[in-house]
Amino acid sequence: MSKLLTNTALSTFRSTRFAARQLSRNFGGIASTAQPVNLKAGYGLDYKKGLLQTQQRQIQLSGARNMFIQTQDTPNPESLKFLPGVEVLGKGNTHDFPSGTTAHGSPLAKLLFRVEGVRAVFFGADFITISKEEGAEWSLIKPEVFAVIMDFFASGLPILHESTPNADTEILEDDDETVMMIKELLDTRIRPTVQEDGGDIVFMGYENGIVKLKMQGSCSSCPSSIVTLKNGVQNMLQFYIPEVESVEQVFDAVDKMADSEFERFERNLKALKEKDSAAPAGGGTN
């Protein structure tokens, strides 16, 4: 009887071990089929988020860590907002790079300007806004920008050599009550809304009832930036601060130089097209 029980137990043990081995092989086969997500394979799944188009991609970093990069449309069709899912400059911090010559303080900005078609770069708290040259295709720019962002965040390098918070709305000792109220309203009500669209708004000064502001990021060259200033920012400032008479957009030397170069390029391109269209067609008989 004891011998029979021993044989039965041995048979059960062998069957259990065989089943466990097969199960292990099956799971091993499943695990071996998992492949890292290729950054340049496909564009992910598009879905609607309110009135904005959002695109999400899963990107495989070193080890088991994943980065989810989303793209979001902005009111400016020439600008696109990239959200890497991690902190970029942190809450309350922004940095504008209107041209490649201004990117010397940021390794990431330098790499982004190497992507063909990129005209301007803007860093926000948790997003990166890319503005493209007119005529450039997002379908060609986006994969390269995805690759740059992924590689950079995997490297662990600093985004800025020296990161400093915005100082334009810092309350100073010589600020009067009106200026303090303007800065407070910009920081608490206006700036967060503008940053949602991939840009920023900077306080440049207040004099004789006129508030001077500078638009950055996607808002700097947005066709509706003037409407935003007049119908949005100006109305809100006037509602809370009766001393405000109007709001003006300020352009610095870099903005003017960039606009001048772009206009010169457009003139040359137009002249070249007119010259080509005026040239006689070849292949005629003598």
Swiss-Prot record:
Give the GO biological process terms: iron-sulfur cluster assembly
Range of the transit peptide: 1-66
For this UniProt entry, what is the primary localization, expressed as one broad class? mitochondrion
Q: Where does [4Fe-4S] cluster bind?
A: C219, C222
The record's annotation in SMART domains points to:
Nfu_N (SM00932)
Q: Which Pfam families does the UniProt record give?
A: Nfu_N (PF08712), NifU (PF01106)
Q: Which domain of life is it from?
A: Eukaryota
The alphabetical list of record keywords is: Iron, Iron-sulfur, Metal-binding, Mitochondrion, Transit peptide
A GO CC term attached to the entry: mitochondrion
Region feature (NifU) = 182-250
- Asked whether the UniProt record includes Cytoplasm among its keywords, one would answer no
Biological role stated in the UniProt entry: Molecular scaffold for [Fe-S] cluster assembly of mitochondrial iron-sulfur proteins.
UniProt cross-references to PANTHER family, sorted A to Z: IRON-SULFUR CLUSTER SCAFFOLD PROTEIN NFU-RELATED, NFU1 IRON-SULFUR CLUSTER SCAFFOLD HOMOLOG, MITOCHONDRIAL
Name of the protein described by the UniProt record: NFU1 iron-sulfur cluster scaffold homolog, mitochondrial
